[in-house]
Regions:
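Catalytic-core signature of thiol
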Residues: 24-150
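Bacterial Sec-dependent N-terminal signal peptides
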Residues: 1-24
Length: 150
């Protein structure tokens, strides 16, 4: 009986400490950020379900670097890069008899290589949305391409 009473008393005591630790502390001023330098940037884009974060992130970096250099804002086509990169990956995969990976992933170097070889176009020229969808969904495309090169 004493053991149960002691256990319950300890549990209640520890719960009271937890509620005290979570007590709302209001600060009348709060923390204020001071902006020392504000840089222009392009809006964030949605890759949706495409497995092409490498393309979106690298082109975002390039677009923002162009802004930093004082050039006008431009919206470059991520899917133009992806399309040409898939062609290059397929050629290399077949040449190596399937001994290398063939998947949706990529790297920043892929982006620079494709721009050097094929160039780059604005988003309005090549959106990559040719099938009535408003977001990129590459699950089926990835499976078809893998089946094609195998």
């Amino acid at each position: 009986m004493n053991c149960k009473f002691f256990t319950i008393a300890c549990a209640l005591l520890s719960m009271s400490f937890c509620s005290w630790a979570n007590e709302n502390k209001t600060d009348s001023v709060g923390y204020q950020f001071t902006v020392t330098k504000e840089l222009k940037t392009n809006p964030v884009k949605d890759q949706s379900r495409s497995g092409t974060c490498w393309s979106f992130s690298t082109l975002s970096f390039i677009e923002d670097d162009l802004l930093r250099q004082g050039k006008p804002a431009v919206d470059l086509s991520e899917m133009f890069i992806v399309r040409n990169d898939y062609i290059e990956k397929a050629i290399k995969y077949v040449r190596m008899h399937g001994d290398i990976a063939f998947s949706a992933g990529g790297s920043a170097y892929d982006e620079l290589y494709i721009i050097d070889k094929y160039g780059i176009v604005p988003e309005e020229v090549y959106t990559g949305l040719n099938y009535g969808t408003d977001k990129h969904q590459h699950g089926e495309l990835d499976a078809i391409l893998k089946g094609y090169v195998d």
